[in-house]
Amino acid sequence: MEPLLLIYNPTAGKGQLPDELAAVLDEFTKANWLVTAYPTQGKGDAVRAARELGPRFSRLVCAGGDGTLSETVTGLMQLEDPPILGYIPF
């Protein structure tokens, strides 16, 4: 199993993401990923999570709106060797 970091905004998509989270985690697990899920708590949180946690993972997926994606990319741009990024829009 390879490590994957999932940074997600629990309020994205009118709060629908938490309802879909189990299905998302199930699909990653079936694909042999060991998932660590990180729910953002406010502005700038995805930047910090991507920057501080990103180096520990070979893949990082963010789930949320354009703000979550923007913050995640901002955090990854601060890394010398960032993980591969995936995006699930909500």
Spans of model-derived segments:
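Small-residue-rich beta-alpha loop regions that form the catalytic core of phosphotransfer
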Residues: 2-90
